[in-house]
A protein has these predicted regions:
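Conserved P-loop NTPase motor module
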Residues: 1, 95-132
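Conserved P-loop NTPase motor cores
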Residues: 1-94, 120
Length: 132
């Protein structure tokens, strides 16, 4: 991979008011590997991808992802995520119970619970508002 396209706050490009944005993200996810590019698409709510107005594009985005990193979610959000990827009951319960820094990492058929550790220097680099 020689290029990474990162989309944070993906909800801005999704939803019934922005079908073109949802199509764009789905096409990027489908075609990125062909152009030696990786795509990182970030959102806080799986419902951004599972809403009926964008479920087709949402499934395409998840179906073409090589990796998922799922941090703690509430019950409804876990249910929404279940519309996009296969989760067993143990994984669903675990995601609801995750503490800060805990996540489910999915790579193909391999799944593992991980702990994301951040150093003080890394945390300080984000400042009090999440950025510089």
């Amino acid at each position: 991979i020689n290029t990474i396209l990162m989309v944070d706050e993906a909800h801005v490009l999704l939803g019934d008011k922005n079908a073109l944005g949802a199509d764009f993200l789905a096409q990027i996810q489908r075609r990125a590997r062909k152009y030696n590019t990786g795509a990182i698409i970030i959102t806080q709510q799986p419902s951004d991808f599972s809403d009926p107005s964008v479920i087709t594009q949402g499934k395409a985005i998840f179906d073409n992802a090589a990796y998922y990193l799922v941090m703690g979610l509430k019950k409804q959000a876990v249910d929404d995520l279940g519309k996009l990827i296969d989760l067993n009951d143990s994984e669903k319960e675990g995601i609801k119970q995750f503490s800060q820094g805990e996540a489910l990492f999915v790579c193909g058929n391999r799944r593992m619970q991980i702990n994301v550790a951040v150093t003080k220097d890394e945390l300080d680099s984000f400042g009090s508002g999440g950025g510089y």
